[in-house]
Each structure stands twice: as structure tokens, then as C-alpha cells.
Amino acid sequence: MEILRGSPALSAFRINKLLVRCKEHLLPVSDIYAEYVHFADVSTPLNNDEQAKLTRLLKYGPSLAEHEPQGHLLLVTPRPGTISPWSSKATDIAHNCGLSKVLRLERGLAFYIHAPTLNDEQWQQLGALLHDRMMESVFSDLKQAAALFSHHQPAPFKRIEILLQGRQALEEANVRLGLALAEDEIDYLLEAFNNLGRNPTDIELYMFAQANSEHCRHKIFNADWVIDGVTQPKSLFKMIKNTFEHTPDHVLSAYKDNAAVMEGSAVGRFYTDANGQYDYHQEDAHILMKVETHNHPTAISPWPGAATGSGGEIRDEGATGRGSKPKAGLVGFSVSNLRIPGFIQPWEEEFGKPDRIVSALDIMTEGPLGGAAFNNEFGRPALTGYFRTYEERVDSHNGEELRGYHKPIMLAGGIGNIRGDHVKKGEIIVGAKLIVLGGPSMNIGLGGGAASSMASGQSDADLDFASVQRDNPEMERRCQEVIDRCWQLGEANPILFIHDVGAGGLSNAMPELVSDGGRGGRFELRDILNDEPGMSPLEVWCNESQERYVLAVAPEQLAQFDEICRRERAPYAVIGEATEELHLTMNDRHFNNQPIDLPLDVLLGKTPKMLRDVERKQVEGTPLQRDDIYLAEAVERVLHLPVVAEKTFLITIGDRSVTGMVARDQMVGPWQVPVADCAVTTASLDSYYGEAMSIGERAPVALRNFAASARLAVGEALTNIAATHIGPLTRVKLSANWMAAAGHPGEDAGLYDAVKAVGEELCPALGLTIPVGKDSMSMKTRWQEEGEDRAVTSPMSLVISAFARVEDVRNTVTPQLRTGQDNALLLIDLGAGNKALGATALAQVYRQLGRKTADVHSPEQLAGFFNAIQELVAAKALLAYHDRSDGGLIVTLAEMAFAGHCGVTVDIASQGEDTLATLFNEELGAVIQIPAARRAEVDAILALHGLADCVHYLGQAEEGTRFTINQGAEAVYQESRSTLRRWWAETSWQMQRLRDNPQCADQEHIARQDDNDPGLNVSLTFDPKEDIAAPYIAKNVRPKVAVLREQGVNSHVEMAAAFHRAGFDAIDIHMSDLLANRRNLQDFQALVACGGFSYGDVLGAGEGWAKSILFNARVRDEFAEFFLRPQTLALGVCNGCQMMSNLRELIPGADLWPRFVRNKSDRFEARFSLVEVDKSPSLFMNDMAGSRMPIAVSHGEGQVEVRDDAHLAAIEEHGLVALRYINHYGQVTENYPANPNGSSNGITAVTSTSGRATVMMPHPERVFRTVSNSWHPEEWGEDGPWMRMFRNARRQLG
């Protein structure tokens, strides 16, 4: 084993945070230093050249200090017997670099700790703080890492002796294996195996438990119900299905696949033909929708829990029909109170929690990062979401009890597109090859389906932790590329049938695949890809290793499928064949036995049906006590409540521009304020049709009125999505995610009433369909503390996600107020005169619940509201729109003022004298801003839709900072907009300070309070409407551009589209094509290296990609020859920029180029940043010098690193800087967030001395269309100014 030191692993502020954690755990640690250390398992000793190559390969990240580290060593490595995702990718890079003697690379994190007084027990405590016990181990010596490369012998399966020991043997196995089997299921299995005349194997029982868990079978939603002694006519699921029976319009697939599908638009989908050339293909892009939850894993281990939640939902989308394309995501969190240190709020009492779960603060620190990281690396923008906190002692139908989200809600959902001929799955023919596509089996995520079906605290702590999966999004990206190549073949698609691998692992996915296809299956255990040979058959078959799909492929198409997988470097294994007989057989050639030999009907047959016999329980509650509520204090408190407060800390960590098809993200207007009501994407890169999604949820209301809470969730989703141009209400489709503490007194009956209110009443009345959803029925946490039983029970929580086809994405209206003309602010109040304050944000911040809550008072008025807003949107009669929701009218107005950077003066006298109720009630409705001149027209449209009595004139938006609310002649509330904005932002700021570089967080918080900030602005030195490439395109000559990607790159399609529009033939070139000599760069006039996460940023962002070129002699020469050839152009963007900066030795005139390293914030940054084009030789930026314009930024490692000040000065003196970050005043800046990575002198793009090669961190390809800019001047046409770059390239090539 070779040992090689790596780069420093933790920044100074990360070290400080670690020291603070030590102090919190009473561990007297004075100093910590951390660096990466690499371990290489080699077949034979490396020679000097190989050693030098390996040393250079493993040199990445910040420069390593010369000194030998001092202190007590704690070495954290992956768990012996496992192979980490880092190892797989680093080893791939080594092999691609010709280091064939390297069998495997692995990486550890060496902590050198100064703590002379720690005893053995404290050292163990410290070790526990530093590692994830499910995935990592701790050693005290570097040489002990040799255990990473030890090999273990496979373990055999075990039989459960029921023939001799009977029921007792099954009961013991139930507890030992964490199967969560009910009494009647134990009886069922006992009878089934007695009839078979044999003992079950452990793998068969585990497989049954996962396939029949509440998580997978949804027993409660399919149960029979008796409430208060009365048998109910329908199950919960039948009431949901009633919405489809009532309104099947526009739904193409419901309830029978991994996601639902509704009609989309006929557009030009942009992808490659059989020769790798990109072009538009006119076809239907139908819309798929799915929303999942991943609550249990997120409570145990937030980052991987949330990451695999997003990853699983993405796989659901990709595995719909015969393969489809995930497109854009949403995410949501409900947790207990944050209790931010130094920022604990008056309503946040400490109620305790069990040790096995993490705190709400930990969840919201790590969970969103995990979800965002997966979406980022996969290449899916996350565009909307919600965040609620609730934890309180309330008076309920069970007396006083604790309600909250100790078991959190982690919501992951999204939209995608699918071809019409692939919506329905194909036929699995007998003899079809049964395939696992994706990563290897690892001993993680065992029993997730069963574990998530139990109330937290019922299962064993080790089983809880074992049930959390770990993520590898770059692997999932590779698998999706395979699926994309398959569906793009149309009728020749080799995929007959596909499912994702989720809860229960292959033990659930493979039986589901063959059963759904009307077949059985015959499998070979040892053909499953396996990174841990020591696993038992149960562990191989049932683990929930992520990023896997199961497929059926016809034997005659296997060679084609193999070719696609090899090109994309996506691992796969043929593990069996489909059989005529409905039977599962698994052979194990290592032990020459059969761990599984089971009829499918035993596994998936008619297991006992559940009966829920429950009672309704209700409590009236006490009215809100208002004596101690003062308006000024109430406003500040409500603006601090997370459900109301700014959520920038949750948003800028997620890529919101990838695909180039994002028309409306969360950030609104020139000041990029996160207040958008819905997310909108374009259906393609050549149209204005699109898709929209929004969220609605009002969970605390269920503590008083279950049905009202459900109705409000539907209503809020509608008032949110109404902001874009949809058309008829029947175009909107809903996903319903139901969370409840089943078995908790009163909750079951309340759940039934809520489902009935939505499925049988409201949705049919509105013509709405719920074709997809999910339930999580174990939302209760139990534990013991100080000798007494404790429990925190979640409110019944319905999260509604609304999805719709969009007629014209350009008509989407935002909350940004306009002040350039006479205007009017109108409140459309759907409260029908009600101003209930029960279960509002106001009640929560004063630790009350109240009595009466908001509700949907008239489905007809709600439908009229939606239709009226749609008419106004289509007529372009609205200047701004924002729904009324959490926090009430005052929050709606404040957020609109924040987005417009203006003042507001309103009069609420027309709504009665109860100021508090008027401002803080959360009845459905919206505030619209209209031109004063169109008031009569707008009033007429509202009246036509039955809303005349709902409309109140409030006042107007105006220049300045004053926020004034009058009650007739009296000003009842006055405050500056900047003060309100500061209060609203403080929760996000405090979370950023805890999680990221506090210096950056402070700079952003200060910047928000600048009343004079002019916002994003544009000053161009050219006309973006001028097509300077047109004369060259007219010659009918299209130069070829190699659109270069490596595994993990995710921005190549929009890049190809930009070059295609500029007159190039864009050709898809995978690095595997060059390494295998299938393609050669001599055939191209231009090359573009695209953005993403090549190799998951293993060995440094872009560095592994670069070294696979530099260390492969033939490919190195090919690149060198291309760069030397005159009349060629090369562009590197984001990951491609990082990669090309490491190829500078091959690029003439690039020897001064810097490296790009970790952002100063130490966080992935997704921003819409203002840049200025510098005068430079760059041929891409020709005639653009002096222009200022915003551009999409999405990266974690974009900070320019130079050797010293002289190096920086040389770059400047040679005029190689092509782009710089500037602030809104037009000044070059290093301040965050105007400069999102902290680069010196604002540098974000450099060029070679000839100008033929340019590298840049921002993404021009994602904003070449005006419509994909988060904000833009209204006069821009189809093309945004960044299109000029690509047309410049076309002009240069003549």
C-alpha cells in the first residue's frame, strides 16, 4: 500500500466550528489541523515515472504546507470492506491515465489534534464527532488503513426454523431483523411456508417484509374503515382515485407507474441523432410529475437522507414508462423549532429529543445541502419549495400534548418530460434479460421500507442508522444518460420495462418489475455487481444502495444496450431472465444453493387487508388571547418565523439555471428577492410553452380542523400557480403527500375526513385531479428521558404540489412591485369576511393555537379567482401578483415591497376595524398591482368571475422606503422597508453564519440593507438583436463544434443549443469517444468543454478530467494539436473552465492562467451575477468590451488562485482578463455576494494571448435566450446578449 499526503481539508472557519463543537461536548481541544491522505493498493511496486504520475494526479485543491503535521492522529476512512464513491471515480481516473498497476485508490481524512488532557473515553467521543459510523471508521495510525484493501469471504444465508419451532421462530426473526411484521402477517407467512413444506430463508422473510411494508404497500390508504362505529364506503385511496374518475382530462397515466403523466406541448426537443449531431426533433413533450418524502432517513442522518430522497425521486421520474427525462425539482422541509444559538425566539421552548435523531437545527443545516448537492450534481434545477417549523405544547382532543416535527418531513419532487409512445411500459417477453443498471451493492440502507413505517423510537438504534442510504449523484447522472440515449431511439428503444431501485433494494424492485410485466424471474446472486464480497445473500439482495434501476431488455437488443452503457461508463449487470412461470428463483453459485425459491403470489399475493376502527376526537380550543399582542412586536416576530422569513440560505445552494430552460426561479427582479409564487420552465429550448409547479400546505390548521387544513393546502397551491399563464383549471394536476401519526388518538379519523374533504368534495367541485401522491403514516417520535415517557406527534400534514402545462412562460407575473406609473394595489379576499387567526403565524409566535381557522369557504369563488387571474395574466393586465399565505396580508405586502425595492402606502379601513385580524389572517387570496388606467377593465373581469364582493382597493406602490398602513385617517403601522427586510432576512443570515463562512454571510446581510442599491442593470456596447452570424449562416456552411463532456458533465445540451443557434453543427463528444479513438478532434473547428461535475469533482473540480487527458499520451497529443492548429476556437465553461485551466501547458498563450479553487464562502453558489466584459484578445468577446449584464453562476470552486501577487499582476498586464464581477453600482468587487466566489479583482474569465481559447466560470449557454434570464429588461427580444458570444465564434470561423 502506497500512502500519499493530500491537500489541507478544512478552511480556517471550518476548524473554528469544529473547535466550538468540541467545546459544546466538553472536550478540551486546543487546536485541530486536517488534511487528506491517499492510499493506493497496487499490484506491483510503481516505478519512478508511475510514482511521479500518481503524485501529480493526487495533487489537487489548496496547496499543501511543507511542514509535517503535529498532534494526536485520528484518521477517518471509509469503512473497511466498502468501496466509497470517491474511490470508484478516482480509480477510474487513474486507469484512464494509464496507471494500470493501481488496483484501487482510497482517501482518508487525517485529523491532527492538540488535546493533551483527553482521556480514552473522551478520545472515543471525539472520534464519534468526526465520522459517520455507518460509512466510516476511525484509526490512530496511517498504516492501519491497509484494512481498506482486505478481502472478506461471502457469508451464507440462514434458515428460520419454523417447522420445528413454529410461530416463536418467526417472532424472534421479526425483532432481530427489524421486519416490522404485523401479527396477521406472521400468521400468513407461517401458513404459506407450512404449505410449501419448508423453512423460509432470512432473505425470503426480509424480501416479504420490505415488499409488504406500509412504505411500499400503503396499507392504511388501502384499508377498510369504521369510524365511530359506522362502516365507511370507501378507502382513502379510492377517494383519491375519485378525482381521476371525475376529471380524467389531460391525464395520460395515473396510479400505475413511478410517476404520473399529463399532456404537455408539441415542441422541438433538442438531442442528438444516431451520429451524435444535435438537432431539434418536433414531438410531444408530455409532462411527468412525482413528489416523494424521505422523512425517516433525514431524521437520522440529514445530508444523505435528503440527498437520497431527491435521488430516489429523480429515479422515479427517469423510470416512468419506458424511460423519460427528469427536468426540474422542488424540495420542502417541516421540522421542529430551530433554536439557533444566540437567536432563540420567544416561542422556541426546549422540549428535548431522543439521542438517535438529530436536532431540527442539524436537519436544516445539513439536509438542504444534501438535497441541493444531489440535484446540482445530477444537473436538475431545484426551483421551488417550502420550509415550516412547528413545535409546541397545545391543548388538543387528547388534552395537553406536544405537537411538532421531531420526525421531519423531507419533501422531494419534480417534473420531467416523456415521449408519447413511451408513456406505457412495454411487454416483458419470456427470456428477456433482467438488468441492474447503476452502482454496486453495498452494505447500506438495509430495511429502509420497514424502518420508515415505524414511529421513531420503536426500532433499534442500529437498525435505524443502517436504514439510511448514501448518495452518489454522478453515478445516477451516468445512468440517466443511458436512459436518455435509449428513449431518444424512439421505437428502437431497447428498454421494455424499467423501475427504479428504492425501498427494499433489489428484493423489492426485481419482483415488482417481473410481476408488473406478468412474468416470473430466474436470477444469479453472484452476477449482481458487489463492492463488499463479504455480504450475505440477504445483504446483497436487500440493501438499498442508491443510483440503481432494474430493466428488462430483449436479448437481441442487449448488444446495443451494452454499447450505450460502455460509452457512458454506466455499470450494469445482467442478473437473470424473465420466465413464463410466476415464480422467483435465485441461485448462488458460490455456495451452490438457492437462497430464494418462492411463488410470486406468496410474496405479493393477497396478504391480510387492514381494518381501521377509529373514533373522531375534537376540541374546540380557546380563542386567541390578544391582550399582550402589540402590532410592532408582532410584525417583527412573524418576519422571524421560518415559514415566513427569507429563505435565501436554502436557495442559493441549489443550481437554478442548469438546462437553460428555467423561466421562473425563486429569485425575483433586479434585487433577486426569493418570493416567487411558482416555478416555471420552458418545454424546450425553442418554444414558449412550458411547465409550472407550486406548493401548498397549512399543516398547523389540522390541529384544529383536519378538513380545513387539507382544503387550504389545495387552495394555496392554486393561488401560487395562478401567477403563470395556464388557461383552464382542469389543466392543473395535483400530487398529494399525506403525513400522519397513524394510531394516535383522533388522527386516523381526522386523516379520513381530510382525504374525504379533498378527494370527494373540493377537487371534484373544482375539476382537479390527484393522479399521484405518497403517504407517510408514522409521524410520531417516542423516547424516554429522566425516567419518563416522552412523545412528539406531528400535525396531520398534507403537502399539495400543483403542476400544469403553461401556454406562454413570458406572461408569468411576479411579486415585484412597479413604481414607474400610476398604479393600484387590490386585495382579492377569498375569506368571505372571515378573518380567523387560529393556527396562523401570529398565533404560533405567541405560543397559541386559537380556535377558528381559515378555510376554503366557497369552491366556486376559488375557481372564479383562478379563472379571473388567468384572464388577467393572459391580458397582461397585472404589474405584480402575490398570494396571501403564512403571515397574512402584511407579509404579502412587505414581500412585494422587498421585490420592488420600493415603498407602500395602503388603507385597510374597508376591511373593518380589527387591524390585527385584517393584517395577520391567512385566508386565501392575493394582492394584485395593476396600472391605475386599467382599473375599470380589471374590476369588470373580477366581477364577471363572481369576485366583486371580494375586491378591496388598498393603495399604491411608490418610490422610497416607507411602509405605511393606514386605518382611515390613522397610520396604524409605519416602518422603513429596509428595517422590515432586515428582520425578514435575519433567520436566513443566522443559518448562513452557522453553516457557511460567517464573513460572507455578514457581507450579504449588510448589502441587503442598502436602500440606494440600484439592483441588477444592463449597459450594452452592442445590439443583441443584431445577428452578426447571419451572413455566414447564409453561406450554408456550418463549422463543427465538439461539445465535449466527461462523466458527470450536465450542461452540454444547452451549450450545444447555443452553438447550434449561432450556425454550428454541434456534435456530442464523450471523453470515452476520444480515449477509444472513436472520434478525433482534427475533425472539428471548435471545441467547448461543458459545465457540471466531472467525476463528481473527485481529485479537484475539473482536475481529474484534465489529468485523464494530460496523462494519456495519444489523447494529450490530440488536444495539443487542436490548440496549436490556427483557425480553431476553444471555450471552457464552469467545470470545463476548471478543466482547461489545468491544460494550460497545452494551450499556446495560456501559461499565465490561474487555477480555480473552493469559493470563499466554502459553499456551492448559484447566483444571477452582474459582470463587465473587459477589453481582451478573446475572440468570443469581440466587440463586447465595456458591456455590463447579468449571467448565471453555479459553482463550488470558482475562486481564482494565483501563485503570488506577481502572477496576478502579470495576468492583468497582459490583458488576459475577459470578465469581472461588478456590484450593482458598476464597480469591480471582491465582496460577497456580488462576487460569489471571492476572486481577486473580480476575475471570472481569462483568455489566451491569441484570444482563441477562453475559459469562464459563469454560464452564458444557460441564458442565451432572454426567457431563461431570472431578470431582464422588458425590451429584450428572443435572444439575450450572451448569444453574442456564440455568434462571435461563428463570425471568427468565416
From Swiss-Prot:
Pfam families: AIRS_C (PF02769), FGAR-AT_linker (PF18072), FGAR-AT_N (PF18076), FGAR-AT_PurM_N-like (PF22689), GATase_5 (PF13507)
InterPro entries (alphabetical): Class_I_gatase-like, FGAR-AT_N, FGAR-AT_PurM_N-like, PurL_large, PurL_linker, PurM-like_C_dom, PurM-like_C_sf, PurM-like_N_sf
EC number in record: 6.3.5.3
Reaction catalyzed: N(2)-formyl-N(1)-(5-phospho-beta-D-ribosyl)glycinamide + L-glutamine + ATP + H2O = 2-formamido-N(1)-(5-O-phospho-beta-D-ribosyl)acetamidine + L-glutamate + ADP + phosphate + H(+)
Catalytic residues (positions): C1134 (nucleophile), H1259, E1261
Entry's Gene Ontology cellular component terms: cytoplasm
GO annotation, biological process: 'de novo' IMP biosynthetic process
The protein's enzyme class: ligase
Chain positions covered by the region annotation Disordered: 303-325
Annotated positions binding ATP: 305-316, 384-386, 676, 885
Places the protein is found: Cytoplasm
Main localization of the protein described in the UniProt heading: cytoplasm
GO molecular function: ATP binding; metal ion binding; phosphoribosylformylglycinamidine synthase activity
Gene3D superfamilies: 3.40.50.880, Phosphoribosylformylglycinamidine synthase, linker domain (1.10.8.750), PurM-like C-terminal domain (3.90.650.10), PurM-like, N-terminal domain (3.30.1330.10)
CDD domains associated with the record: GATase1_FGAR_AT, PurL_repeat1
Recorded metabolic or biological pathway in which this protein acts: Purine metabolism; IMP biosynthesis via de novo pathway; 5-amino-1-(5-phospho-D-ribosyl)imidazole from N(2)-formyl-N(1)-(5-phospho-D-ribosyl)glycinamide: step 1/2
Entry keywords, A to Z: ATP-binding, Cytoplasm, Glutamine amidotransferase, Ligase, Magnesium, Metal-binding, Nucleotide-binding, Purine biosynthesis
Residues that coordinate or bind Mg(2+): D677, E716, N720, D883
Regions that span the bilayer: none
Family stated for the protein in its record: In the N-terminal section; belongs to the FGAMS family.
Assembly and oligomerization: Monomer.
Function of the protein: Phosphoribosylformylglycinamidine synthase involved in the purines biosynthetic pathway. Catalyzes the ATP-dependent conversion of formylglycinamide ribonucleotide (FGAR) and glutamine to yield formylglycinamidine ribonucleotide (FGAM) and glutamate.
NCBIfam families: FGAM_synt, PRK05297.1
Protein name as catalogued: Phosphoribosylformylglycinamidine synthase
Annotated source species: Pectobacterium atrosepticum (strain SCRI 1043 / ATCC BAA-672)
